[in-house]
Amino acid sequence: MAMNFVTFNQDYSYLAVGSVSPPSATSKGFRIFTTDPFAKSYETKEGNIAIIEMLFSTSLVALILSPRRLQITNTKRQSTICELTFPTTVLAVRLNRKRLVIVLEDQIYLYDIQTMKLLYTIQTSPNPNAICALSPSSDNCYLAYPLPQKAPPSSFNPPSHTPPGTTHVSPTSGEVLIFDTLKLEAINVIEAHRSPLACITLNSDGTLLATASDKGTIIRVFSVPDGHKLYQFRRGSMPSRIFSMSFNTTSTLLCVSSSTETIHLFKLSHPTSSPDTSPSSPVGRDRSLSQSSSGYSPDRGDLTGDVGSSDFPARKHNGTLMGMIRRTSQNVGSTVAAKVGGYLPKGVSEMWEPTRDFAWFKLPKPSQTSGGSGNNGPLRSVVAMSSNTPQVMVVTSDGNFYVFSIDLSKGGEGTLTKQYSVLESNDRLGYSVTDY
């Protein structure tokens, strides 16, 4: 079995895995799992699934079975509700209780999910990576996507982390357009980054937007719909591809995964609070390097890679005198920075903002026998946070489902507590490989 697509539902209570296989093989279709406890809920071996999206905990699923064909299915009744064919390849599907969104490379279709009536068609600039987010909320029913450009960029340099010999297509811009899918009108444009967007996500209430550019060093969080910047975090100093971002259900934490295979959690506390008292992460120590640069600008992380490495080995605080002095100086420095920053112009004061992650953990190295997509590239991952316990759930492209526990009071390095496989095709499907 080859895993072709993986996604969580809107409240992270279910996980869906779509698979493809050669015509001679029998392992294809899709599977749906409950996440807590982890168990198989539904399975079908029909069809090569390119995309699957669930509607909360209902039996309604949206499937892309061929590049241009959408099928809405009721898994409980084993029936097809409707089928739609589009002029070009469907790149992404988003849905909530009010709207169904179909993303093509240069168009977005909006449907009333109750009647499947086409409500609106949005013309976009080329968006081959299907960068788009729909709020799960039925009240704040906002859609976010890259702002269309009037003309394509005259020149574009691919990011340094793009593998040699590959074609890198730039998204439209670093600006995000907020569209009200109930009123069917654009309501705001958020200037998120100078570099092209790589990943965006909305929280469960539709009141917060997280963004990352293709540099992957800076993560920003804005209020929706007014577009005020509330937080600015540094993931690391070296460029990296952001694979997934997810708020927890209470919007107090933001989880980010990237090609470094380190998962970062950022705390959405009051903007004036300082997270520097939390244990240092592998990338947190790079912050002093980037902030001491005399040529610092607010978007420096978007424009160039800072000196340093984002993969220092993690280490705990030591109990020596020098260790105590170091921690004390960090706390004093953050307090002074907060006060001094208030007297500086906005563009300069941003260098003083607290940007360290609150918690982090490193994904285990994939085994040689792992299944997955068969891709020899970086280990891709999708992240979500449990609504019931302080845990982070991660699904990787090699077919593993990990559960990490985090300390909400202290932060620091998370602990791997459970590991499952989503690729087994026999009765042991979803069995616990490891239960720590």
UniProtKB/Swiss-Prot annotation:
Motif L/FRRG motif boundaries: 233-237
Renumbered ranges of WD repeats: 192-232, 237-276, 374-414
Keywords recorded for this protein, A-Z: Autophagy, Endosome, Membrane, Protein transport, Repeat, Transport, Vacuole, WD repeat
Coiled coil: none
Pfam families the UniProt entry points to: PROPPIN
Keyword Protein transport applies: yes
Places the protein is found: Preautophagosomal structure membrane; Vacuole membrane; Endosome membrane
One term of GO molecular function: phosphatidylinositol-3-phosphate binding
SMART domains: WD40 (SM00320)
Transmembrane segments: none
Record SUPFAM superfamilies: WD40 repeat-like (SSF50978)
InterPro entries in UniProt: PROPPIN, WD40/YVTN_repeat-like_dom_sf, WD40_repeat_dom_sf, WD40_rpt
Membrane-related topology note: Peripheral membrane protein
UniProt GO cellular component terms: cytosol; endosome membrane; fungal-type vacuole membrane; phagophore assembly site membrane
GO biological-process terms attached to the record: autophagy of mitochondrion; glycophagy; nucleophagy; pexophagy; protein localization to phagophore assembly site; protein transport
Region annotated Disordered, chain positions: 268-315
Compositional bias annotation for Low complexity: 269-282
Function: The PI(3,5)P2 regulatory complex regulates both the synthesis and turnover of phosphatidylinositol 3,5-bisphosphate (PtdIns(3,5)P2). Necessary for proper vacuole morphology. Plays an important role in osmotically-induced vacuole fragmentation. Required for cytoplasm to vacuole transport (Cvt) vesicle formation, pexophagy and starvation-induced autophagy. Involved in correct atg9 trafficking to the pre-autophagosomal structure. Might also be involved in premeiotic DNA replication.
Similarity comment text for this entry: Belongs to the WD repeat PROPPIN family.
PANTHER family: WD-REPEAT PROTEIN INTERACTING WITH PHOSPHOINOSIDES WIPI -RELATED
Domain remark in the UniProt entry: The N-terminus might form a beta-propeller domain involved in specific binding to phosphatidylinositol 3,5-bisphosphate (PIP2), leading to the association of the protein to the membrane. The L/FRRG motif is essential for the cytoplasm to vacuole transport (Cvt) pathway, for the recruitment of atg8 and atg16 to the PAS in nutrient-rich medium, and for its recruitment to and dissociation from the PAS under starvation conditions.
Subunit structure: Component of the PI(3,5)P2 regulatory complex.
Descriptive protein name: Autophagy-related protein 18
Organism the protein comes from: Aspergillus fumigatus (strain ATCC MYA-4609 / CBS 101355 / FGSC A1100 / Af293)
Lineage: Eukaryota, Fungi, Dikarya, Ascomycota, Pezizomycotina
